[in-house]
């Protein structure tokens, strides 16, 4: 019986395979992506659709959990094997099972390998092919970009979260479970950010459109700035006169001795001059034509 480099798992007793030399040259892309059923047939003990967490921890702890031969559902449970790829995980990495079988069955183990080192040294020969396949669009990288970094997976060999699980060595099943919790938290946080309600636009912060007339402040009004402090607005000249362009001028009785009360030498009647049609400026210029903003001229009451 050949002792596996993983202390809790024996290759021959579980797979029926005899350790052999690592193939050289590297298998071609077509060979790696060949019929997955052949892989399942070569590893009878792994060719089961579902395994509960207890079985995985008991029988395949260091083998499956460290090599990532098990996928997770959206709830994070150890439910399905990665051979073939887990449905819904967005993984097209079923070929990796062939690589791992070749790695595991290679002999002898590297000197000093104690089962707690990363598998980066074993995956490195495949890195050029992995990068080449990424360039060909064979893999999706979004899962790794979002979640793979949370478990410290090496980016040059990891192309999605399944790869992060495949190529990251954990010291214990507890460490593996902790990494899954980190992943679930990352998924939850990303989902919360995507589904968070957008803050409503602040109407006070909106800038006026070019050409739009800003509302005038009337005498005695107080505008609040962003700090919430009231600001006394100085009334304009028109407001000082008692009216502005937004309010019709009030009817004021004429006072004797004022310029607005003049006696006509011909009729002897008192006539009331209407106020300027467009504020003080128009009155100074002597313009009495009505404008869109002017109030209707008042005629003397008989």
UniProtKB/Swiss-Prot annotation:
Which cell locations does it reside in?
Answer: Virion
For this chain, the annotated S-S bridges are: none
> Which residue ranges are recorded for the region named Disordered?
217-302
Q: Where is the composition biased (Polar residues)?
A: 288-302
Q: Mind naming one GO cellular-component term on file for this protein?
A: helical viral capsid
Bias (Low complexity) ranges: 254-271
Query: Which keywords label this protein?
Result: Capsid protein, Helical capsid protein, Virion
Q: What's this chain's function?
A: Capsid protein self-assembles to form a flexuous, filamentous capsid (Potential). The capsid encapsulates the single-stranded RNA genome.
| Protein name stated in the entry | Capsid protein
Organism from which the protein derives: Botrytis virus F (isolate Botrytis cinerea/New Zealand/Howitt/2001)
Q: What is the lineage of its organism?
A: Viruses, Riboviria, Orthornavirae, Kitrinoviricota, Alsuviricetes
């Amino acid at each position: 019986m050949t002792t596996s480099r993983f202390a809790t798992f024996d290759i021959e007793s579980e797979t029926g395979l005899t350790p052999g030399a690592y193939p050289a040259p590297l298998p071609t892309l077509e060979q790696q992506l060949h019929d997955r059923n052949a892989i399942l047939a070569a590893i009878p003990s792994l060719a089961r659709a579902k395994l509960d967490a207890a079985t995985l921890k008991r029988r395949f702890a260091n083998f499956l959990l460290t090599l990532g031969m098990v996928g997770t559902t959206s709830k994070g449970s150890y439910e399905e094997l990665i051979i073939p790829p887990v449905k819904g995980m967005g993984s097209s990495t079923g070929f990796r099972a062939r690589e791992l079988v070749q790695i595991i069955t290679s002999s002898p183990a590297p000197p000093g390998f104690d089962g707690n080192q990363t598998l980066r040294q074993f995956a490195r020969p495949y890195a050029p092919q992995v990068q080449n396949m990424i360039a060909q669009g064979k893999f999706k990288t979004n899962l790794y970009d979002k979640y793979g970094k949370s478990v410290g997976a090496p980016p040059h060999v990891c192309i999605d979260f399944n790869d992060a699980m495949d190529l990251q060595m954990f010291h214990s099943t507890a460490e593996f479970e902790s990494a899954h919790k980190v992943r679930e938290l990352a998924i939850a946080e990303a989902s919360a950010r995507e589904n968070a309600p957008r803050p409503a636009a602040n109407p006070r912060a909106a800038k006026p459109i070019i050409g739009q007339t800003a509302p005038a402040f009337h005498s005695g009004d107080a505008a609040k700035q962003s700090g919430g402090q009231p600001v006394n607005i100085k009334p304009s000249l028109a407001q000082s006169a008692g009216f502005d362009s937004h309010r019709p001028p009030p009817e004021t009785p004429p006072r004797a001795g004022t310029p607005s009360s003049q006696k006509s030498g011909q009729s002897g009647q008192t006539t009331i001059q209407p106020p300027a049609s467009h504020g003080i400026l128009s009155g100074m210029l002597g313009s009495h034509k009505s404008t869109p903003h002017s109030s209707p001229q008042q005629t003397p009451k008989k």
